[in-house]
Design a protein with these regions (language model features):
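Short, polar loop motifs at secondary-structure junctions
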Residues: 101-108
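Conserved active-site segments centered on acidic
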Residues: 19-90
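Sec-dependent signal peptide recognition
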Residues: 1-10
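Short, structurally constrained coil/turn elements
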Residues: 13, 49, 80, 110-112
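Hydrophobic/aromatic beta-strand patches that form the interior of the parallel beta-sheet core
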Residues: 56, 98-101, 115-117
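Hydrophobic h-region of N-terminal signal peptides that target proteins for export
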Residues: 10-18
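A short, aliphatic-rich alpha-helical micro-motif
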Residues: 94-95
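Phosphate-binding/catalytic loops
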Residues: 108-150
């Protein structure tokens, strides 16, 4: 009976470890536009696919608030989370990240072994919100396809 109990405990521990939510970090200059759009849509689409991932947005030089165009666009899209505040990327953010997506150059001092992708080809979302949002969503869907296979 003792061995069976230990086996059950071991299986529960393995399952809880396997079920831990994995983190994706989206980084843009101000943490107020592209990274917010990306994290918002990543979380929505990952949830729809029942994937155990969560995204956070960060900035290398964060603004004090999410850009008004981003707030407006995400509100119209019904995915805006008013609790999001631009936050500076810290080394500790990258520690347990599964992947880091950069819309800007990686800041000095952030050296990580985490897989990093460069999405800097997407321009400012304030200029043409829908066009930029759609480009971000397309990249997110490709990323989710990749993550789904692992």
């Amino acid at each position: 009976m003792k061995i069976l109990t230990q086996l059950i405990i071991a299986m529960l521990l393995i399952n809880s470890t396997m079920a831990q939510t994995k983190k994706i970090i989206f980084v843009c200059d101000h943490g107020a536009g592209k990274s917010v759009v990306a994290a918002s849509y990543f979380n929505k689409l990952a949830k729809e696919r029942n994937l155990d991932y969560v995204a956070e947005c960060r900035g290398t030089n964060p603004d004090s608030i999410v850009s008004l165009k981003t707030q407006e666009g995400l509100t119209k899209d019904d995915v805006y989370d008013a609790k999001i505040k631009p936050t500076k990327l810290q080394l500790s953010d990258t520690t347990n990240a599964e992947r880091i997506i950069l819309f800007t150059a990686a800041p000095q001092g952030i050296n990580t072994k985490v897989k990093t992708e460069n999405w800097s080809d997407i321009e400012n979302v304030d200029a043409e919100y829908q066009k930029r949002r759609d480009a971000i969503i397309q990249k997110i869907n490709s990323l989710l396809d990749t993550l789904e296979k692992h």
